[in-house]
Each structure stands twice: as C-alpha cells, then as structure tokens.
C-alpha cells in the first residue's frame, strides 16, 4: 500500500543493556511498518551506528526468525549520545531521510531519547516522532509497568536458582545468589518469590549491619532446628559495602560448623536465551 501521512521512512535502533525480546519487538515493528507501506530501516550499533551511517533497509524476510531469537540482531550499546555527537546524528537522520525513529531499550535508551528530544530546537533533524519501546531486565523505566525482557529474566533466574537449590539441599548449606537489576529490586524480588528464598536484600531497602547480624542469628537457629537449605537473594546494587562475599563471610563465621556457605552471581545468563511467550 501507499504510505499515508507524512511518515514514509522509519528507523529502528536498540540502546541500553540487552533484554530478551528486543528482536521480537523489532520484527513486529518492521512487518507492521511494511504492511502500512513504510520503508523500514535498521540501525546497526545503536546511537554511534546511526552517527556513522550504519543504516540499512529491512525487508520482510530480513527479520524472518527474529520472533524467538535471543540477543539483538541490530546490536546494542549502553552509551548515551554525548552533545558532541548530536550534529552527526542530525546529519545522519537527514541523509537517510528518516521521518520517525523507534528506539528499543532500557534506562540508557530512555536517557538518550530524552537528551535528543531536549535539543530539538537547536537541531531541526530531531523534530521527528521518536518513540521508545521499554526493553530491560531491570524493569526500572518511568511510566512502565513491565518492560520487555523482564519476564524472561525472572524465568532465567528462577531456573538457575532451582538447580542451585537441588545441589545445596544435598547437604546443610546456605546459598547466596546475586541477581542483576542495577538499582531496581524488581528482578530480585520476583525471583525470590518464585524460588522460595528465605532472605532478600535489595537497593530500595539497603541492608544494615544490624539486620545482617540478626538474619544470621535466625538462620543459625533454623539450621539447628533441622533445616537443610537456606536461600538468600541479593540485588547487585543492594549495598555499597555489604556485597555477597561479605554476606558469605558473616554467615559462615556464625555457622558454628553446622552448615557451610556458598555464593554465586547469576550474571548475564539472565539477559540471554529466547524470550518467554509473555515477552
């Protein structure tokens, strides 16, 4: 069909940390745009890719198989475009005749879009529709109830923790698992609920030394009562001082030889894999 309205060429780029479902969102946007008669463009390498003119047209078949593919086929970076890059971005938008920009990403994408739209009076090329689709395992974007990728990250974390529990339950053991999420405790909270964790430490309620000591006392008492496994989840930014190694040292020092302590960061596996059906 012939394009309607002023929009004819739409560019898609990823920005911020990787989130499962980024490819799915891009695929839907490309095919919906083509169905409306628009020319859909893919920007490789996020904002710096746009500044360097790494822009190519995406056809219907180019996004074949992206529906359940993990990663980000167009590439993504956490960089927020600096002021020095605005001129290059504006020129790239003009050269490629981009009528609208669709950004898929998390908090850094949000900050990047805000930085660009704040300068639209100085750079006429930025006076185009710019839309952000929230995609972040952290689920920390303003005005967004649930970002793309969050559900998959919770499933990934729960899957890993379940296997940790099977291993730890074989002997009396306290296990501390560190989740991602930056300064937002949503991923840690939901993973704790779904995995049945006894303790949870998040940035919103940063733990104190007194709380950790009291928790250690309660844990020792529970092991003396016959408990075989004690699971603790820790957000990666829960505390500036009390990280998982510190918690492990405290819990181990108070163990009285009744149990042993292990700790593990779940790491980037929370960002990987195919998106869940919900995402």
Where are each of the predicted segments found?
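Catalytic, metal-anchored helix/loop core of enzyme active sites in primary metabolism
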Residues: 259, 268-279
């Amino acid at each position: 069909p012939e394009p309607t309205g002023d929009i004819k060429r739409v560019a898609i780029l990823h920005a911020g940390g990787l989130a499962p479902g980024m490819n799915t969102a891009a695929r839907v946007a490309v095919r919906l745009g083509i169905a409306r008669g628009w020319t859909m463009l893919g920007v490789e390498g996020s904002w710096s890719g746009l500044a360097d003119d790494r822009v190519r047209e995406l056809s219907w078949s180019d996004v074949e198989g992206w529906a359940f593919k993990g990663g980000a086929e167009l590439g993504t970076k956490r960089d927020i475009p600096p002021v020095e890059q605005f001129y290059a971005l504006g020129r790239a938008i003009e050269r490629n005749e981009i009528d609208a920009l669709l950004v898929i990403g998390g908090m850094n994408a949000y900050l990047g879009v805000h930085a660009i739209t704040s300068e639209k009076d100085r750079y006429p090329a930025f006076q185009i529709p710019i839309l952000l689709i929230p995609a972040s395992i952290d689920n920390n974007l303003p005005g967004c109830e649930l970002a793309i990728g969050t559900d998959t990250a919770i499933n990934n974390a729960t899957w890993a923790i379940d296997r940790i529990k099977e291993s730890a339950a074989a002997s009396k053991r306290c296990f501390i698992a560190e989740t991602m999420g930056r300064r937002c405790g949503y991923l840690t909270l939901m993973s704790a609920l779904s995995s049945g964790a006894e303790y949870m430490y998040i940035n919103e309620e940063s733990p104190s030394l007194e709380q950790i000591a009291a928790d250690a006392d309660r844990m020792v008492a529970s092991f003396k009562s016959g408990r075989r496994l004690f699971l603790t989840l820790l957000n990666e930014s829960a505390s500036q001082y009390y990280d998982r190694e510190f918690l492990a040292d405290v819990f181990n020092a108070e163990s009285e030889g009744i149990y042993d302590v292990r700790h593990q960061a779940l790491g980037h596996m929370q960002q990987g894999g195919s998106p869940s059906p919900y995402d």
